[in-house]
Each structure stands twice: as C-alpha cells, then as structure tokens.
Design a protein with these regions (language model features):
Chain A
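Register-specific beta-strand positions within repetitive beta-rich fiber domains
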Residues: 1-32
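Exposed extracellular interaction/assembly regions and N-terminal maturation sites
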Residues: 20, 24-110, 119, 123-125, ...
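A conserved acidic, glycine/proline-rich C-terminal tail/linker
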Residues: 113-114
C-alpha cells in the first residue's frame, strides 16, 4: 500500500504541502507564485560546515572573517539520509550568501563532489548550490552564480 | 470549511495550477520539469521602485542608465499583501536583470531588510531576489548571484 510522508492542505485559500510527521511547511501553491518555505542558518566564523539539515533549511548566511575560508558540504550519506524519498537524478538546492569580508571556497566531503572546484564565493557574493543525486549517498554539487 | 483561491486542472496532459479568480497560471507539473509562470516588467530608468506587483510578476529587466541607480523595495506590508496565504517562513523569488550600463544598489522600504546591503547588481549581471516573510509586516531580501 502506498505511504505518504507529505500531506497537502488548503490553508487561507492556498494549497500548502507539509511534512506529515513534523507539519513543517514545504511549498505552497499561491495565487500568483510558488511559496517556498526556508529556514535561515547563520555562521560567524572563518570556515563553515553546516549540517545536512541546515543545508536543507535552504539559506545559509556566512559572516566570513579572519582569512580565506571554506564552506564544507555534509557527506553524501548524511545528505541522502536527511532527504527522504529523493530519487537518483533529483536535486535539492540551497542559497549561500557570503556576507563577510573573506573569499570562501566550497569544499567537498565523502560522497559529494564539487563540479567546479575553482569557483569561489567572494565577499558580498552569493550562490545557489544544487545537489544532484547520482547514486545512493552520492551527489554532485553545482555552484551557480557567484 | 476550507476555501480555495487556486485550482488545479489537467491541460494538455499536464497538471496546471491557476489563480481561481483570474485564471492566470501559477505553476505546472510538467512531464519533465516544474513550469513556473512569470510576467516580465521592463524598466528604462536610472532608479526603480520594485513594487509588489513587479515581484509577483517574477522577472524585472532594468535598463539602468545615466548613473548609479537605486532599486527601492516596496513596503513589507504591500509585498506580503500581494501574495494571499503567504506565511511566516515562506519565500517568493524575483529575477532581477540589469541589462543597462550602470551599477544598481538595492535599498530598503518600510518593513523590509536586505541581508547584504553592500551587494550590487552591476551592468549585464542579474540576481535572484529571495524574499522571505519574517513577520506579519516584514520581509528580508536575500540577493543571490550578482
């Protein structure tokens, strides 16, 4: 029998999809546009290594400082475990904003490769990180816009 | 009893969501991708007030001219009112393209904040503006990519 981990519900006249377990909103079909639910994580340090859950929150702001820093992605196993139902070929994305005064390089972890390791996020720049699942516990991170 | 401001309809074999009153499309679950309906606003001026209606349309093409320009956000109240059903934590996106010759800087309106006020959109660059509802009357704008 089919099971569901998400539910849809009419709220204030719009169709909202929620996590069935936690009831956290996911996405809403509004009257004009899609509404995407996001949770912001802020990091104040030279280097950042947010958790899989923080990446999945959707926005990471980084007050980079002291010297050139790194943003280390979680392992593929941790990311895969955190996104229930993600199929091979599907993606999740995260907005990353460098609000500090140092250049940041996105750094791989076990099970996640970075498509362009030469690309950096300079101060007051931002990027969209797209994680494409290529196999169980395995992703490629595509780095857009900085 | 639940009421709905959007409706879903099967059209040409794909599932399209429309504004129930105006019948304007919102988004479509296509056979390959999610299709997002967007309306383009063209601005030919040094400065622009980024109105709630422009944000709702989804794409602004700004031919900046004369000198460095300012893109001033509408008020938080107006932006939130433009998206019925928008809840705290929800976000909407607006693509902002500077196809002119001058540098553009975002400026706050009442009830709006900009995460990184130092970030600009230079000539022939573009940004994704992620507008996140923080409270009943306030939003924060995250500028991605310029």
């Amino acid at each position: 029998m089919a099971m569901s981990l998400v539910k849809s519900i009419w709220e204030s006249g719009v169709l909202r999809f929620r996590n069935k377990g936690t009831l956290t909103p996911i996405i809403t079909l509004g009257t004009l546009r899609l509404h995407e639910y996001l949770v912001v994580t802020d990091v104040d340090s030279r280097n950042a290594a947010p958790t899989a859950a923080q990446f999945l929150g959707g926005i990471i702001t980084h007050n980079s400082q002291t010297g050139a820093g790194t943003l280390t992605v979680p392992t593929g196993a941790l990311l895969d475990a955190a996104v229930q139902g993600l199929a091979i070929g599907e993606t999740v994305k995260c907005y990353y904003l460098n609000r500090g005064d140092q250049t940041v390089t996105v750094t791989a972890a076990a099970g996640i490769t970075i498509a362009d390791t030469g690309q950096t996020v300079a101060t007051t720049e931002a990027a969209i990180l797209i994680f494409l699942k290529t196999a169980a516990d395995t992703f490629v991170c595509y780095h857009i816009g900085a | 009893m639940a009421f709905s401001l959007v409706k879903s309809i099967w059209e040409s074999g794909v599932l399209r969501f429309r504004n129930k009153a105006t019948r304007t499309p919102v988004a479509t679950i296509g056979t390959l991708r999610l299709h997002e309906y967007l309306t383009v606003t063209n601005v030919d001026a040094q400065d622009n007030t980024l109105t709630a209606a422009q944000i709702a349309g989804g794409i602004v093409v700004h031919t900046s001219e004369v000198g460095g320009g300012t893109v001033t956000l509408d008020t938080g109240v107006n932006i939130i009112a433009a998206f019925p059903g928008l809840a705290i934590g929800d976000s909407v996106k607006c693509y902002y393209i500077n196809d002119g010759t001058e540098v553009l800087t975002l400026a706050v309106g009442v009830g709006t904040a900009i995460l990184d006020v130092a970030q600009t959109i230079t000539a022939n660059e573009a940004a994704v503006l992620v507008i996140l509802m923080d409270s009943a009357t306030t939003v924060t704008v995250y500028t991605i990519g310029a």
